[in-house]
Swiss-Prot record:
Belongs to the class I-like SAM-binding methyltransferase superfamily. TrmB family. InterPro entries: SAM-dependent_MTases_sf, tRNA_(Gua-N-7)_MeTrfase_Trmb, tRNA_methyltr_TrmB_bact. PANTHER family: 3-DEOXY-D-MANNO-OCTULOSONIC-ACID TRANSFERASE/TRNA GUANINE-N 7 - -METHYLTRANSFERASE, PENTACOTRIPEPTIDE-REPEAT REGION OF PRORP DOMAIN-CONTAINING PROTEIN. Catalyzes the formation of N(7)-methylguanine at position 46 (m7G46) in tRNA. This is tRNA (guanine-N(7)-)-methyltransferase. Coiled coil: none annotated. Pathway: tRNA modification; N(7)-methylguanine-tRNA biosynthesis. The lineage of its organism: Bacteria, Pseudomonadati, Pseudomonadota, Gammaproteobacteria, Alteromonadales. The keyword Protein transport does not apply. One of its GO terms (cellular component) is tRNA methyltransferase complex. Substrate binds at residues 150, 182, 219-222. Pfam families: Methyltransf_4. It catalyses: guanosine(46) in tRNA + S-adenosyl-L-methionine = N(7)-methylguanosine(46) in tRNA + S-adenosyl-L-homocysteine. The keyword Ribonucleoprotein does not apply.
């Protein structure tokens, strides 16, 4: 196991699987609404992906060879569904551990009639380790992850050196890791980790943050934050090696 500084991933390989002792999330089980439960029952056989099935053949999953965008922790899925609807020429994979969010996302996707979205209900780090082939993703998105704002919890932040090194191999050359956070301290942490990570180039002309690109929908949460004077920081790093 690597002994690099603060990491939320203490991993060892055993039989080809990653073993983790520190997780970047706390699983809070909320109640499903009737609509969410119905959407899971109806849509999961078509849109659901299972971690236990192992490595994906993405062209088989989607029935085409379109570029693939993967989002970690999509919450209730509104932005992800909007992106998939606005970009039918791309394929999207969303990963979320909270079942109500999965149900809400499937409900919206079904209502929107989109066919270019697939969903995992599983730990994203394990999905990346076991299900996503190297050089298979055009974009990897991480929007508003848990900031773990207390210093003693910083090791739980998902953006750490080992995690970034793993996802770099899964991005195609020229692929982009796009992050967004409304916690300035976490933005600074992300920037520090990414600047130290080999094989990435910052797409910011000022070598720090980028304006929110049009492709990332503005959420209601974000709009409220803007009205209250809260900042949001986007970071986009391109794989170069």
């Amino acid at each position: 196991m690597s002994e690099s500084s603060n990491t939320n991933l203490e991993q060892a390989k055993q039989e080809g699987k990653y073993i983790r002792t520190i997780r970047s999330f706390v699983k809070r089980e909320g109640r499903l609404t009737k609509g969410q439960a119905a959407a899971i029952e109806k849509c999961w056989p078509i849109m659901g992906l299972e971690h236990k099935n192992g490595m994906l053949d993405l062209s088989e999953v989607f029935g085409n060879n379109n570029d693939v965008v993967l989002e970690i922790g999509f919450g209730m899925g509104k932005s992800l569904v909007e992106m998939a609807k606005n970009a039918p020429h791309l394929n999207f994979i969303g990963i979320e551990v909270h079942r109500p969010g999965v149900g809400a996302c499937l409900m919206d996707a079904d209502e929107a009639g989109i066919t270019n979205l697939r969903i995992f209900e599983h730990d994203a780090v394990e999905v990346l380790a076991d299900c996503i082939a190297d050089e298979s993703l055009t974009t990897l998105q991480l929007f508003f992850p848990d900031p773990w704002h207390k210093k003693r919890h910083h090791k739980r932040r998902i953006v750490q050196g080992e995690f970034v090194e793993k996802l770099r191999s899964q991005l195609k050359m020229g692929g982009v890791f796009h992050m967004a956070t409304d916690w300035e301290n976490y933005a600074e942490h992300m920037l520090e980790v990414m600047q130290a990570a080999p094989g990435f180039k910052n797409q910011s002309t000022t070598n720090d943050y980028v304006p929110r690109p049009d492709l990332r929908p503005l959420t209601k949460f974000e709009q409220r934050g803007h009205r209250l004077g809260h900042g949001v920081w986007d970071l986009m790093f391109e794989r170069t090696k």
